[in-house]
Regions:
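Canonical Rossmann dinucleotide-binding motif of NAD(H)/NADP(H)-dependent dehydrogenases/reductases
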Residues: 2-33
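Conserved glycine-rich Rossmann-like NAD(P)H-binding loop of the short-chain dehydrogenase/reductase
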Residues: 28-44
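The beta1-alpha1 cofactor-binding region of Rossmann-like NAD(H)/NADP(H)-dependent oxidoreductases
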Residues: 39-40, 57-69, 104
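Conserved mid-core segment of classical short-chain dehydrogenase/reductases
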Residues: 90-108, 131-137, 157-160
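Active-site helix of classical SDR
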Residues: 122, 164
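Residue(s) in the substrate-gating loop at a strand-loop-helix junction
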Residues: 148
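Active-site loop-to-helix junction immediately N-terminal to the catalytic Tyr of the SDR YXXXK motif
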Residues: 154-162, 171-174
């Protein structure tokens, strides 16, 4: 896919890999909707990237919030051609530590953001891309999910993170 003049959503775009991805896309001529839960940081990053960047504050694991972010991108740009899922959190906790077994709530939180959130945004963005016209190559869009080496080589004290990234890798490969 040629990036220039295409419209993307990047999740986790306020910092790190998401911010770098959004910057690369804007520099390549794309328009980008930066999505993040951190309102101040995502607004500042969008402002820094200029006129081809917009932002939406959203918890991507929430169906309505993710749909609002997709709708905002389509409303701002007229169509959607790509999604890059970079949103993710790390929970440092051993399965069995000195304080007892891994907390289920903390495990669930990481899975909700990293896996459920990524899938939620993926399915909603795919629906928006399917509504658009195919380009000269017959493409309607592209979806890129980011994982981690932890998907294949789990890390001590990061069971939830490794499990979520393994699931993202499995979800992406078919």
């Amino acid at each position: 896919m040629h990036i220039a003049n295409k419209h993307f959503i990047v999740s986790g775009a306020a910092s790190g890999l998401g911010a770098a991805t959004a910057q690369m896309l804007v520099e390549a001529g794309a328009k980008v909707m930066l999505v993040d839960l951190n309102a101040q940081a995502v607004e500042a990053k969008a402002r820094e990237l200029g006129d081809n960047a917009r932002f939406a504050v959203a918890d991507i694991s929430d169906e309505q919030a993710a749909q609002s972010a997709v709708d905002a991108a389509v409303s701002a740009f007229g169509s959607l051609h790509g999604l890059v899922n970079c949103a993710g959190i790390v929970g440092a906790e051993k399965v069995l530590g000195k304080q007892g077994p891994h907390g289920l709530a903390s495990f669930t939180k990481v899975i909700n953001v990293n896996l459920i959130g990524s899938f939620n945004l993926l399915r909603l963005a795919a629906a928006a891309m399917a509504e658009g016209a195919a380009d000269e190559s017959g493409e309607r869009g592209v979806i890129i999910n980011t994982a981690s080496i932890a998907a294949y080589d789990g890390q001590i004290g990061q069971a939830a993170y490794a499990a979520s990234k393994g699931a993202i890798a499995s979800l992406t490969l078919p």
